Amino acid sequence: MISFGTFLLMQSPSARSSKEIYARGVEMAQAAETLGFGNVWLAEHHFSTYGYLSRPAQLATYIAAKTTRIRVGTAVIVVPLHHPLVIAEEIATLDLLSGGRLDVGLGRGYQPYEFERFGLELESGRARWEESVDILLKAFEGRPFTYDGKLFKIPETTIFPQPLQQPRPPIWITAQSPESVEAAVRRGFNVLTGGFGVPIERMAEFRRLFDRLVGEFKPPHPLRVGVQRAVYVAEDHADARAAAEEARWNMRVTLSLRNQYERVERGRAIPVPAPKEPDTDDLLDRFLVIGTPDTVIRQIKRIEEMVGITHFNCSFWFGDMEHARVMRSMERFAREVAPAFR
């Protein structure tokens, strides 16, 4: 059975106020709990209107205090941008304050634009990632440890507090490349793939690689696979096509920031057209989950068949879509789509 979550990037092409963007995010998280979603996942981005959410653990703590059941998750903490001991302390604190409702999403990051402004190089991210994850796992063992790496030298240290979930909260890795899939399976972490700009056939390739690597590494417990997609439950075909064009903003900015042809003007992310950009029909077929309720059900079942998922993460808020329209789509999904998967 598929579990459903919702994802908050908290972008604003029109550069709305931070107060408005955060109020929208909190309202969506509370609505997600009321509507029966199992998770709310929070991104981490910096220095542009592509994402106002720079401290996902802080917002997750606030959301946890405003809810009682829904699990909160980071999707993701960009590990190389932080000291691993600080990450460990934040994760443990959030897990305690949420009553053990935390899922931890970790990632290497993909935007040179962000890394440069922290005085880092994206190319160094892989080495920082590997050592940081080593340290995180040691920190969650609850006993003194040392670490002697190339990048981090840690004398005997014990982390306080320790997380409520033992031996640690579930860890998910965002995987947009074969290397990330391998890193997740090798460590015994769950995999979350998809996102803007990743076609369905690419996700199916990742699943085949995942299955092969599970056979090679033989993790000690079953691993979960999830997919994240822009989702909109439309009134009709014209409404669906209009929503797809809103999602195009996210795809353009994502790809431009990933591939270093971005335009950011006074913090405002500009949607630069991508080379060989898919047309609207192609977006709807291969990149998005947008359409009438029956269409959305068919699209998710297609992903389930091709990718073999146990978790589906809905990005309901994308582009500059009006808040009321986002909330209507979210409510229709809970009422008319989710029951088909129970």
Predicted regions: what they are:
Residues F4-T6, V40-L42, V72-T74, L102-L106, ...:
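Hydrophobic faces of well-ordered beta-strands that scaffold small-molecule active sites
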Residues F4, A32, G36, E44, ...:
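Conserved, mostly hydrophobic/aromatic
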